[in-house]
Amino acid sequence: FLISIPYSASIGGTATLTGTA
């Protein structure tokens, strides 16, 4: 999960990070 945060943020950006959270 912790790895998925920066990983997704690098691809989708803030939108993905907010969606995952």
Swiss-Prot record:
<protein>
    <recommendedName>
        <fullName>Phylloseptin Bu-1</fullName>
    </recommendedName>
</protein>
<comment type="similarity">
    <text>Belongs to the frog skin active peptide (FSAP) family. Phylloseptin subfamily.</text>
</comment>
<dbReference type="GO" id="GO:0006952">
    <property type="term" value="P:defense response"/>
</dbReference>
<keyword id="KW-0027">Amidation</keyword>
<keyword id="KW-0878">Amphibian defense peptide</keyword>
<feature type="modified residue" description="Alanine amide">
    <location>
        <position position="21"/>
    </location>
</feature>
<keyword id="KW-0964">Secreted</keyword>
<dbReference type="GO" id="GO:0005576">
    <property type="term" value="C:extracellular region"/>
</dbReference>
